[in-house]
Regions:
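Conserved beta-alpha junction segments in alpha/beta enzyme cores
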Residues: 1-88, 95-146
Length: 146
């Protein structure tokens, strides 16, 4: 088995609108600054010809349409099985909205969206390039405390 990983900063440049917490009036305005950057992390497991790609980002969620676009793009470009691409979000209510087409606050940014898709592909490429032999083990143990 080989495993590769990648990490990318995904904080947008310029005006950054935040997602989540609908009842805050300032959600309709851009953020006043960046307290902490947001990141994406990826890991690729390879066993023979089989690959499983996990991509996680510090965002609220992935819309189904975006997830479908990502899976199609990775399958067409790199030959990975669509069912072996998993996207997850940290569900961060203070993250960016630029990638989200249908959120009610903030502003969707087509350029950022395309850049984000590109970043996912770059993470896949980096994972493949730095994949190294690894051993995966699974254990289970009941722990009791008083």
């Amino acid at each position: 088995m080989n495993i590769g990983h990648a990490r990318r900063k995904i904080t947008p440049q310029g005006d950054i609108y935040l997602i989540g917490y609908r009842n805050l009036p300032n959600r309709l305005e851009p953020a006043t600054g960046v307290h902490d950057d947001v990141f994406a992390n990826a890991i690729l497991f390879q066993q023979g010809e089989r690959e499983v790609f996990l991509f996680n980002a510090d965002v609220l969620e992935f819309e189904e349409s975006m997830a479908e676009e990502v899976k199609t793009m990775l399958a067409e470009r790199y030959g990975i099985d669509r069912d072996c691409v998993l996207l997850s979000a940290t569900h961060d209510h203070t993250s960016i909205v630029a990638y989200h087409r249908s959120w009610w606050t903030g502003k969707f940014d087509e350029n950022y969206y395309r850049w984000f898709l590109d970043t996912i592909c770059q993470c896949f490429e980096v994972c493949r390039a730095n994949a190294q032999p690894a051993i995966c083990r699974l254990g289970k143990q009941a722990v009791y405390y008083t």
